[in-house]
Amino acid sequence: MKKTTSQNGFTLIELIIVMVILGIMAAVAVPRYLDSIENAEESTENAVISSIRSGLKQAANDSLYTHGRASWPTNPFEVFVAGQEPAGYTTDNSLANDDGEWTFFAVGNVTKISHQRNDNRRFTWTYTKAVSYTHLTLPTILLV
């Protein structure tokens, strides 16, 4: 009887080709993944700042209705219901220094909102509390 042997498996060339294809796919996918993370963090920042702006308008309207005069909080994060602040918000009155951290702090007469992204980049916004409710003196939040 003739003995037959079957060899199952991949040749070295086939394995190398698969590795090259996987390398090309990874080279394309990783930068896109990192860009999507950055875009998500930027969108989160925009959403938080928009929420603060909306809350400041509502706080002014509530104050106007209750006291007859519009006023705004010194800390813009006070517009959030307790426990509803953005994830990572701390009240340590310093520049954000942890990933995902949001802070509000004052340096002299300048008040700022800061956020540190997961890649350790920090972004700050200057918050200027308004004095009266006219089109010229609304509170401003500007990216620095």
Regions found by a protein language model. Give the residues of each.
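Extracellular/periplasmic head regions of type IV pilus-like filament subunits
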Residues: 61-121
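Conserved small/polar residues in nucleotide/adenosyl-binding loops
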Residues: 134-140
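N-terminal leader/signal peptides at the extreme start of proteins
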Residues: 1-10
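Membrane-proximal N-terminal amphipathic helix
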Residues: 38-66
